[in-house]
From Swiss-Prot:
Protein family according to the UniProt entry: Belongs to the eukaryotic ribosomal protein eL18 family.
Keyword Nucleotide-binding: no
Protein name: Large ribosomal subunit protein eL18
Gene: rpl18e
GO MF, one example: RNA binding
Length: 122
């Protein structure tokens, strides 16, 4: 065993990664396997995305998954559906004020099991 474990030691993140891998196999949707790989990364390599980046890369009505943390930097003026591992309260408020929707990743998988139309933002 390596002296410093790599990947998540947080049991909730490990369960989320396991859930995503099972969903990828069950639905033949490789997008969930890719999201699981990002979730399993060590803490220093995890994804951090600001709301302003979502405003730049997403179109109106897009469904977006952030395999890391969503922070409140920047402005959002598009109605989008966002799911992330963690979302700061201020970022969630900005998404909702723009007319969007905030989901957890398991909720997103249940709503879009095949992953069609879901974009990964890293």
């Amino acid at each position: 065993m390596p002296p410093n474990p790599t990947g998540p030691t947080n049991s909730q993140l490990r369960m989320l990664a396991r859930f995503l891998r099972k969903a990828a196999r069950a639905n033949s949707a490789s997008i969930w396997r890719v999201v699981a790989e990002f979730v399993e990364k060590p803490r220093r390599q995890r994804v951090i995305v600001n709301v302003g980046k979502l405003n730049r890369v997403a179109k109106e009505g897009d469904v977006v998954v952030v395999p890391g943390k969503l922070l409140a930097g920047g402005q959002l003026n598009k109605k989008i559906i966002v799911a992330a591992v963690k979302i700061s309260p201020k970022a969630a408020r900005k998404v909702i004020e723009a007319g969007g929707e905030v989901l957890t990743i398991p909720e997103l998988v249940r709503k879009y099991p095949r992953g069609s139309g879901v974009r990964i933002v890293i």
